[in-house]
Amino acid sequence: MEKKFLKVGKSISFKFNTDGLECNLTPGMVYNIKVDRFTENISLEESGSLSLPSKVYCTARDERFINKVINSYNLSENGFTGVMLAGLKGSGKTVMAKCIANKSGLPIVNVDKNIRPYILKCLVEKLGDTSVCFLFDELDKLLEDYDDSVLLQVLDGSDTKGKHMILFTCNNTDDISEYLIDRCSRIRYWREFEEMSPSLIMEVLNDKLNDKKEVKSLTDFIKDNFEVCSFDNIASFVKEANDYPTTTFEELFEDMNLSSKGTIKPHSRSCKNSGIKSKKKDVSCDCCWDCCCAG
């Protein structure tokens, strides 16, 4: 295969001049798209590898889904294998997208909201038969001021000579173009993310909670009280429980950026029964100044 790129340091340019060394894109390497604001020339910049937690919590169903996506891409002959991971914030969509991207064995091109649709279209044309995995995190936010008609053209494959994987994550599907929904030729796989199952919650607590005697009690507390049982919220709460081992679950909960199902139900570690927490936090003199949960 003819090499289409030139490398100078970490900067990867398309071969429109003779400066630099000829190269191919590296499997598993993340590339950010760079656009010269004067000439609009497109280049790719190496950005290392995707960061993942030391342990990824994955169900057997998750594993089957990931393997199916990879297998379908490998069986495809051209165009895009599209995947949408949608649903609850902090539920592991981005982690799964990264796992799929890594397992694909492809160079990974990160697409952020600063990359205009026509730039993406031009990039696909320049890539030719070089296969990559495109990663769009939080597509719903990106589409707020995005011409999605060009994205639809890209997914239709009219400018695609090779084959690519394209991974999307999305929190709010209401913001997604109706022309992406129920269109398997554009997005073949659509996975909805919901709350963590009790068995998965217990697995996380067994791994992360210092006081193993409290695993069952904290699992019950989470199931009974957390309005949103996402990995993000649960991992943050476990860290609080480890950092403040003498504080009741209720007090930890009251101080965090969490909403309850209603009246807080106490469990083993608890030593008080008072307090009702509404779904929306009330403004008081004890305001939470910083959000301790990512995303």
Whereabouts are the PLM-identified features?
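Conserved ASCE P-loop NTPase core motifs with emphasis on AAA+ ATPases
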Residues: 22-55
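C-terminal alpha-helical "lid" subdomain
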Residues: 1-30, 183, 190-295
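Hydrophobic positions in the central parallel beta-sheet of the AAA+
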Residues: 134-137
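Pre-Walker A (pre-P-loop) alpha-helix and adjacent loop at the N terminus of AAA/AAA+ ATPase modules
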Residues: 45-82
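Short glycine-rich substrate-engagement loop in P-loop NTPases that contacts/grips substrate
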Residues: 64, 101-130, 145-149
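Walker A/P-loop nucleotide-binding motif
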Residues: 76-97
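Conserved nucleotide-binding/hydrolysis micro-motifs of P-loop NTPases
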Residues: 115-116, 140-141, 171-176, 195-201
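Conserved catalytic/switch belt of AAA+ P-loop NTPases
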Residues: 140-184
